[in-house]
Design a protein with these regions (language model features):
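Conserved adenylation A10 loop of the ANL superfamily
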Residues: 118, 279-285
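Structural core segment of the AMP-binding/adenylate-forming
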Residues: 165, 169-257
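A short N-terminal helical cap/helix-turn-helix that marks the beginning
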Residues: 48-71, 88-110
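Active-site diphosphate/adenylate-binding microenvironment
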Residues: 67-89, 156
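Short, contiguous pre-domain boundary segments
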Residues: 19-44
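Conserved pre-ATP/AMP-binding loop-to-beta segment of ANL
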Residues: 107-109, 230-235, 246-281
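Conserved G/P- and acidic residue-centered "switch" motifs that form tight phosphate/ATP-binding loops
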Residues: 150, 171, 285
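Conserved AMP-binding/adenylate-forming core of the ANL superfamily
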Residues: 93-94, 107-165, 182, 186-187, ...
């Protein structure tokens, strides 16, 4: 890790209180992290954003990297259909991952993951960029392109954000469906989004219970009217035996087999600031 102290060492648990002990450990940022906080005076920041919102958000946007800058921060000519950063070109995956992987931050931790069984995985920005690029190439090899929709129905694994970022990398629109949703809920979201590819796991663990995610996907896809899904990518999480389909209208693939020979280099799609990034369905709450 680039810093003298690792990211893990910066997470210091506070002294347990009776309330905290009953629920969860509370982590207090180190004094170094607090000193480097981006907002030192919340009230002053809020007043500045209210007084001059366009200038405020332009200042925030200047913290990102753009292929082309905007001609107008906010276009209000067709309310309520506002347009932000008119004419600007960017890619959120580049800003979230690539620009860090190209600097000394490539060795800093991007993710610290802990499973339900307390197993851990650590992934640096450099490693994350490599995995995102490889999966982006996997998607492209299956015909996914800019503007296409991809449904992601997975457990809480690192491959979930990798899939999301890979979609953003190539301009595909991802739709994350909560892994606890039913067959009917998943089917409805696939139909509505018109996804042609689903990314899932063989299974997931929630509160000690195994969830048959792959079986739920299978049940959602074999329906009348048929869904537009042509390909399913399965990440091996639980090790449970699942049926892999190879039919004229649908083919299933193992994540690890596709990733094995995928190139770690992938060109980033240039996106308009108003291009859609994802589709997120409310459950009605």
């Amino acid at each position: 890790v680039a810093d003298e102290h690792s990211d893990k060492e910066k997470l210091k648990p506070m002294s347990d209180t009776p309330q905290a002990a009953d629920h969860a450990t509370i982590y207090k940022p180190s004094s170094d992290v607090i000193a480097r906080a981006r907002i030192s005076d919340w009230d002053a920041t809020k007043r500045a954003s209210d007084a001059a919102p366009n200038a405020f958000w332009e200042e925030r946007a200047n913290e990102l990297e753009w292929y082309e800058r905007w001609t107008q921060v906010l276009d209000e000519s067709n309310k309520p259909f506002y347009k932000w950063f008119v004419g600007a070109k960017c890619n959120i995956a580049y800003n979230a991952v690539d620009r860090h992987a190209l600097t000394f931050r490539r060795n800093k931790l991007a993710y610290i993951w802990q499973g339900e069984d307390y197993s851990e995985r650590f992934m640096s920005y450099g490693e994350l960029a490599r995995e995102v690029n490889k999966f982006a190439n996997v998607l492209k090899s299956l015909g996914v392109k800019k503007g296409d929709r991809v449904t992601i129905y997975m457990g809480r694994v690192l491959e979930l954000p990798i899939a999301m970022l890979a979609c953003a990398k190539i301009g595909a629109i991802h739709s994350v469906v909560y892994g606890g949703f039913s067959v009917e809920a998943l089917r409805g979201r696939i139909h509505d989004s018109q996804s042609e590819l689903v990314v899932t796991c063989d299974g997931a663990f929630v509160s000690g219970k195994h969830i048959d995610l792959k079986q739920i996907v299978d049940d959602a896809l074999y329906t009348d009217p048929p869904t537009p899904v042509k390909n399913v990518i399965v990440y091996k999480r639980s090790g449970k035996e699942v049926k892999m389909y190879d039919e004229p209208n649908r083919k299933d693939y193992w994540w690890h087999e596709l990733m094995k020979d995928a190139s770690p280099d992938c060109e980033t799609e240039v996106m308009d600031s108003e291009d859609p990034l994802f589709i997120l369905y409310t459950s009605g709450s």
